[in-house]
Amino acid sequence: MTAKLIDGKTIAANIRQQISGRVAERRAQGLRAPGLAVILVGSDPASQVYVAHKRKDCEEVGFNSVAHDLPSDTRQEDLLALIDQLNDDASIDGILVQLPLPKHLDASQLFERIRPDKDVDGFHPYNVGRLAQRMPLLRPCTPKGIMTLLESTGVDLHGLDAVVVGASNIVGRPMALELLLAGCTTTVTHRFTRNLAEHVRRADLVVVATGITGLVKGEWIKPGAIVIDVGINRQTDGRLLGDVEFEPASERAAWITPVPGGVGPMTRACLLENTLYAAEHLHD
């Protein structure tokens, strides 16, 4: 068996095209373009690349993109004041704080300061709580993007044994909520899990988000399973590898996401979707 690739790059491009068309319709109706404010603190090279991609995406679809690039010694109270200012700005529909932040800053406090209706990353406790209560509003971008990738396969998720490897607030925990909502029997594994291989071997669907290159071995994959690899780990030779051993896994799985070109583009596309949703349904 050779797995079919789930092409996140192409699916994300289609989403951007649809959003661009909707923004053009808004402008023709005399409505403003959606606005996204991105806050970048410090000069982390990877963060700078990610933010540049997000700004390019905004430009492509016709959003109003507002950049706030701040020095690494920015104080917590100054960031909170900036968020308050953006909360009150009617031209801004979404506020994004790029992670990781310098160690002296409290990310949780910053996320909670963002108004829930402008929390386009989906990290605010209100939005996570709505997802847990089966009433999602602004959904965390990476899990939301993964659900779109899964929908593209046409596979019925109801009743599947799903295993999420990694329990972060950004991916693992909200991913488990999304899969429960989709009717999966969901297990979350983490750093204290015993015998990870045993859990993965029985999974019809496995989502891996740990940041550990090749953590999940190809031989663990159940024949015919769906494999979603969220990891993107740069090697010393410049290659980008995922958290799953791709080649042997693709010989056993029915569907698999590539790294790069799988989950990453979908996270960015869903950020745009959330911003458009906030503009049209929460702010217009």
UniProtKB/Swiss-Prot annotation:
E.C. no: 1.5.1.5, 3.5.4.9
The record's Gene Ontology cellular component field reads: cytosol
Name the source's superkingdom. Answer: Bacteria
Q: InterPro entries given for it? A: Aminoacid_DH-like_N_sf (IPR046346), NAD(P)-bd_dom_sf (IPR036291), THF_DH/CycHdrlase (IPR000672), THF_DH/CycHdrlase_cat_dom (IPR020630), THF_DH/CycHdrlase_CS (IPR020867), THF_DH/CycHdrlase_NAD-bd_dom (IPR020631)
Q: A GO BP term, please?
A: purine nucleotide biosynthetic process
State the coiled-coil residue ranges: none
GO MF terms, alphabetically ordered: methenyltetrahydrofolate cyclohydrolase activity; methylenetetrahydrofolate dehydrogenase (NADP+) activity
Q: Which reaction does it catalyse?
A: (6R)-5,10-methylene-5,6,7,8-tetrahydrofolate + NADP(+) = (6R)-5,10-methenyltetrahydrofolate + NADPH; (6R)-5,10-methenyltetrahydrofolate + H2O = (6R)-10-formyltetrahydrofolate + H(+)
Identify the pathway: One-carbon metabolism; tetrahydrofolate interconversion
Instruction: List the keywords (alphabetical).
Output: Amino-acid biosynthesis, Histidine biosynthesis, Hydrolase, Methionine biosynthesis, Multifunctional enzyme, NADP, One-carbon metabolism, Oxidoreductase, Purine biosynthesis
Residues bound to NADP(+): G166, A167, S168, I232
Protein task: Catalyzes the oxidation of 5,10-methylenetetrahydrofolate to 5,10-methenyltetrahydrofolate and then the hydrolysis of 5,10-methenyltetrahydrofolate to 10-formyltetrahydrofolate.
Give the multimer and partner information. Homodimer.
Name the family the entry cites. Answer: Belongs to the tetrahydrofolate dehydrogenase/cyclohydrolase family.
PANTHER family from the UniProt entry: C-1-TETRAHYDROFOLATE SYNTHASE, CYTOPLASMIC, C-1-TETRAHYDROFOLATE SYNTHASE, CYTOPLASMIC-RELATED
HAMAP family according to UniProt: THF_DHG_CYH
Q: What name does UniProt use for this protein?
A: Bifunctional protein FolD
